[in-house]
Design a protein with these regions (language model features):
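Short, basic/hydrophobic alpha-helical segments
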Residues: 180, 246-263, 275
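Acidic, metal-coordinating catalytic cores used for nucleic-acid/nucleotide bond scission
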Residues: 267-276, 294-297, 427-429
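Short amphipathic alpha-helical "interface-anchor" segments enriched in bulky aromatics
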Residues: 394-422
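Secondary-structure transition/capping motifs at alpha-helix termini
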Residues: 23, 142-150, 168, 184-185, ...
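Basic, amphipathic alpha-helical segments enriched in Lys/Arg and hydrophobic/aromatic residues
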Residues: 425-446
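Short, flexible loop/turn motifs enriched in small residues
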Residues: 9-12, 214-221, 229, 377-379, ...
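An anionic, glycine-rich sequence signature occurring as long contiguous blocks
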Residues: 218, 235-238, 284-398, 466-517
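Dynamic "connector" segments at or just before major functional cores
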Residues: 1-192, 196-201, 224-237, 242, ...
Length: 517
């Protein structure tokens, strides 16, 4: 099929001319295809508003995706003026921070060739909670457009980018590099494991109806490992929403072992406790702490035997602002009856609150006397099981380090664009989650470093965003950073330049005044 080319306002455009026919004496055209602007004539790469950058085979008439390695520039058509005043501080700070902590080496391992698109999208996930459709608007008004000039943030190209990022070979390469980076900072073998639901109404195999703790939803389930000492995520696994937590323990830990990172201690929620999982952990010499559900026989046996002597003075311990009675009991767990330690506890505040609510329901005739008695008996009781013999006043601090993973989920969902899901394929889902994990890792690092100064991450980026820059032909000057912005720069050891030289596509920071020659 022939392609016609023509120049207009200095730009080359292409179309398939179609064929002519007569209609009531008039010559008309049919089969005309406007391909848009020519990006690469030799390889038949074009660009238009409908498809973004794409390929077209003139022999078969088939449209395709432009190769992901394609980074040819799309020159401005002159109708849109380039912005000369841009948001500067936030993107300059993030670019310098990622390089200073060595995380750019992790990003470089991802096989997506247009690294400008990758880095720009990482910044977008860190700085904006809007849909990806708005990424180009943000990019055009931010210094990121100078840092990453070859980034292509059109809507269709972002979809292609996410699908490429989510391919198995890409996710595996990322996890390998990321785990290696975390290990270079801290080799703590203690990990936290938990899962969270990602609600999703789009139909693909990973979406399923979930009943998690009594909450019914259509979702994808994400199981995550977090390093205890640093709070950094290590990796995640995705399962359909109807896969229960207890079946994911061994496979999730195995993903970590495959990357030569050991784990000799794992803290889990109650949903992961089964005899099979306990046997696997003992076989691999992995110690553990987990909460034990009241549905297990061993729970009820220990309560029956030891609850009458639990609330005694010698068993009362303080944990932060809570007072809890705790009694350690040696027990046998698993198919092989391994020696472990159960910590039977009674939370005074929680027991009082649950009893008050039960009495209120009973007063409204919403519960029977038998049910009320059972509720009052069990109010405030809980049990933690561990393979290690912690002291009674040490088990709660050890167990509640798992709040780190809950904080990580809060960071991921609140500051790293984890939810809502706006993807239509499994590959795009994985690509989105990889970007969210990258953003969450940087957010965790920022939180760890600034916890003593500012707890609100948004305050950091909004303060930095107030620092603008002016783009000239060969220089980029930036305004004076505010006092708080200077504090952030100082905490992270980042020096803000006086101006930035643009020379042969390179950005050269200049920190001192130079007299013109």
């Amino acid at each position: 099929m022939e392609i016609n080319y023509q120049f207009k306002n200095g730009n080359e455009y292409a179309k398939v001319p179609g064929t002519s026919y007569r209609d009531n004496g008039k010559v008309r055209k049919k089969g005309v295809i406007y391909l848009g602007r020519v990006i690469d004539k030799e390889h038949h790469i074009f660009c238009n508003r409908e498809r973004g950058i794409f390929s077209y085979d003139p022999d078969t008439g088939v449209f395709g995706k432009a190769d992901e390695t394609y980074i040819s520039d799309l020159k401005s058509d002159g109708r849109k003026k380039q912005k000369i005043l841009l948001d500067f501080g936030d993107s300059f700070f993030l670019d310098a921070l990622i390089k200073s902590i060595g995380y750019d080496t992790v990003l470089n391992t991802l096989p997506y060739r247009n690294k400008d698109t990758l880095r720009a999208m990482v910044q977008y996930y860190l700085l904006c909670n809007s849909a990806n459709d708005h990424a180009k608007i943000w990019y055009e008004g931010n210094f990121a457009s100078i840092l990453y000039p070859k980034a292509n943030l059109t809507s269709q190209r972002i979809t292609d980018f996410l699908e490429s990022l989510g391919r198995p070979e890409s996710t595996s390469a990322y996890f390998d590099a990321h785990v290696s980076w975390v290990r270079s900072i801290c080799d703590d073998p203690a990990v936290l494991m938990d899962s969270t639901g990602l609600p999703n109404s789009i139909h693909f195999p990973l979406t399923a109806v979930s009943n998690h703790n009594g909450k019914i939803s259509r979702e994808v389930r994400m199981t995550t490992l977090v390093q205890r000492d640093t709070g950094y995520p290590l990796l995640f696994r995705i399962t359909p929403g109807n896969i229960v937590d207890l079946s994911t323990v061994t496979r999730t830990l195995n993903e970590l072992f495959l990357r030569d990172m050991s784990a000799d201690f794992v803290i889990m929620d109650a949903g992961y406790y089964t005899n099979d999982n306990i046997e696997e952990l003992y076989a691999c010499e992995v110690d553990f702490i987990t909460r034990l559900s009241s549905k297990y026989t061993i729970y009820n046996q220990i309560v029956k035997e030891h609850e009458p002597t639990l609330r005694r003075k010698e068993n009362l311990v303080q944990y932060k602002d809570r007072y809890v009675y705790i009694k350690r009991v040696e027990c046998k767990i698993g198919h092989k009856e391994h020696t472990a330690y159960a910590y039977l506890g009674y939370d005074v505040d929680r027991g009082s609150d649950e009893s008050h609510k039960a009495l209120k329901r009973a007063a409204q005739n919403q519960t029977s006397t038998a049910d009320l008695h059972k509720t009052l008996e069990n109010s405030g009781l809980f049990m933690i099981v561990s393979s290690l013999p912690f002291e009674e006043d040490g088990i709660l601090p050890a167990y509640y380090t798992r709040q780190l993973i809950e904080q990580y989920f809060d960071i991921s969902k609140g500051s790293s664009k984890l939810t809502p899901l706006r993807v239509h394929s499994e590959e795009a889902l994985y690509g989105h989650l990889i970007l969210s994990m990258i953003a969450a890792t940087i957010n965790v690092h920022i939180q760890n470093r600034t916890n003593c100064i500012y707890s609100n991450k948004e305050e950091i980026f909004m303060t930095l965003r107030n620092q603008k820059c002016t783009v000239y032909k060969s220089k980029i000057t930036n305004a004076e950073p505010q006092k708080k912005a200077n504090e952030f720069y100082e905490v992270f050891g980042i020096k803000c330049p006086l101006y930035i030289e643009q020379s042969n596509g390179q950005l050269i920071p200049v920190y001192h005044l130079e007299k013109p020659v």
